[in-house]
Structure formats: C-alpha cells, structure tokens
C-alpha cells in the first residue's frame, strides 16, 4: 500500500507539475499588446500566409515580411495587430540571406510588442542541376539562401527567446533534406545542412526551454514548385511527379501550415530537435513490407 500511495502521490505531483507547465507555456513573452506574438518570416509564398491566418485566428499579434496581396488587411480583420517589416522580397534575389535581415524582423517585434513567442522562417532558392552540371556559382547561391539564411534566422530568433525562457521556432526546409533529388544537388545539399543546423540549435536552446524544429515540405501545390520541375506546362511531368508520391496527390499549403502551427502554438513544448518531412509519404517510399 505504501508503494501504491507513493506512486499515487508521485502521479499527483507530476499531474500538478504538468498543469503548471501548461499554464506557463500559454503566457507571453510580449510586454506590450496583451497577446502572444508570432513572427512569420515570409508571408508571401507557400506555408507563410496560411500560417499567419492560423495565428490570427488563435488571437496572436503578428510580425510579418513580404505579405501576400490583401493578407495584412485580412489579418487585421481577424483581430491581430500586424507589423509588416519592409525590404524583403521572394522573387529573387531573396532577402533572408542578407546580413542583419532576420535581426530587423526581431527588432520590429521587440520594438512594437516587447517580445515574441513563436517564429517561423522559410528560406528557399531552387537551383536545378545534377552533380555533373552544377556550377560553383549555383552552389554558392544555394548555400547563401538555403543554409546561411537559416543561420542568420536562428541567430536572430534564439537570443530573445532564450533570455525569456520560453518560445518555439520552426524553420521550413525541404523533404529533400532527407531524401535527395539528384537533379537538385546544390539545393538538397544545403537543405540537409540546414536541417542539421536546426538540430544543433535545438540542443543549444533546450536547456532554456526553447523548442526548435525543422519541417521539410515537398510536392506542395503552389505555382513555384510546379514551375521548378516544369510540371506547370507539361501534364506528363505532373503525372510522373504524382506517381512518386505514395498518397498520389500534391499537398495543400494549409495542410502543412496546420502541422507547423502545432509546433508553434505554445502548448507543444516537449518536442524539439526534429526534422519532420511533410511530403505525402515520399520520404518512406520504397520501404516496402513483406
């Protein structure tokens, strides 16, 4: 009975501790504005606009870059106070690799709200070439946007969150971080490097209560992806792509945003240092069971 009582008491302590931890997670690092604050570093393409809408519906204030047409007004109508940091573009040359770019976004969050709770960054530059045709110039461009920009983002996001003692970061990379495409040798190389960088950053930040994860997408249903592979004008290429995906279809951006939101909503505070592919099962394709 003593053992059972001890286990019960231990369980009660753990339950109380978990409840206290959850309550703590839902507080905000922001000192102004009365709401939790999220940074969406690229609200123009891919996941970003969808994630920003989800944050607004969760009663967050927002700091965003390069918003899609009409997005800022939409977020405000949903009740968010929105700061748009100017000077960023997604239609090459991308701006995230500029020294100090990510820091400007963080500074905007600190100036307006006195802190932030969640940060998402998408950095991307597709260079199409295999190992026999890639150039030093193409490799360097890919390094700047797909790897160096991730370092700058993490170096900007982490210090204020670590000082506050709580927060979450998601870096969008690519499913090719784990399963390469030989026709995108530079892209895959530096996406893989970025995924490892995120895992290293997570270990650095974990003792301070910060969660850092990478989400790697592929086969997303947006024009840029289809154009890169020539599938926007060639139905046969699109069909060939679909045949590579176990789920047999392209992924929707809002599906990926939903997954990212679960890593950034202030409640999932025991998941860190991971690379999550969001690619319809592609990363496990070929791993057949008997």
Descriptions of predicted regions:
Residues 206, 211, 271-273:
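Short, small/polar-rich loop/turn modules that mediate ligand/substrate recognition or access, typified
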Residues 168-193, 198-207, 219-220:
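Catalytic loop of short-chain dehydrogenase/reductase
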Residues 125, 132-151, 170, 194, ...:
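Catalytic Tyr-X3-Lys loop
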Residues 90-103, 111, 118, 124-140, ...:
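Conserved mid-core segment of classical short-chain dehydrogenase/reductases
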Residues 272-290:
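Short C-terminal tail/terminal secondary-structure segment
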Residues 154-155, 199:
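A short, exposed helix-loop element centered on a Lys and neighboring polar residues
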Residues 159, 203-204, 269:
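Alpha-helical segment proximal to the catalytic Tyr-Lys
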Residues 25-63:
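Canonical Rossmann dinucleotide-binding motif of NAD(H)/NADP(H)-dependent dehydrogenases/reductases
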């Amino acid at each position: 009975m003593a053992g059972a009582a001890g286990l019960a008491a231990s369980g009660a302590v753990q339950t109380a501790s978990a409840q206290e931890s959850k309550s703590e997670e839902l507080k905000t690092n922001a000192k102004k504005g009365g709401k939790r604050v999220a940074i969406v570093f690229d609200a123009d393409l891919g996941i970003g606009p969808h994630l920003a809408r989800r944050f607004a519906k969760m009663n967050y204030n927002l700091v965003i870059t390069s918003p899609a047409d009409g997005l800022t007004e939409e977020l405000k109508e949903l009740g968010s106070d929105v700061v748009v940091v100017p000077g960023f573009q997604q239609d090459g040359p991308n701006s995230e690799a500029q020294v100090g770019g990510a820091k400007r976004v963080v500074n905007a969050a600190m100036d307006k709200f006195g802190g932030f709770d969640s940060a998402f960054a998408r950095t991307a530059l597709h260079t199409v070439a295999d190992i026999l045709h890639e150039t030093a110039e193409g490799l360097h461009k890919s390094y700047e946007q797909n790897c160096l920009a991730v370092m700058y983002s993490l170096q900007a996001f982490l210090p204020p969150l670590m000082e506050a003692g709580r927060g979450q970061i998601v870096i969008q990379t690519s499913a090719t971080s784990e399963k390469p495409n030989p026709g995108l040798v530079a892209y895959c190389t530096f996406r893989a490097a970025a995924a490892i960088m995120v895992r290293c950053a997570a270990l650095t930040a974990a003792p301070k209560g910060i969660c850092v994860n990478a989400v790697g997408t592929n086969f997303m249903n947006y024009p840029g992806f289809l154009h890169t592979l020539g599938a926007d004008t060639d139905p046969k290429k699109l069909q060939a792509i679909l045949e590579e995906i176990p789920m047999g279809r392209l992924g929707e951006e809002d599906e990926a945003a939903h997954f990212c939101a679960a890593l950034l909503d202030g409640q999932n505070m025991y998941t860190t240092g991971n690379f999550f592919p969001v690619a319809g099962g592609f990363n496990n394709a070929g791993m057949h069971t008997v």
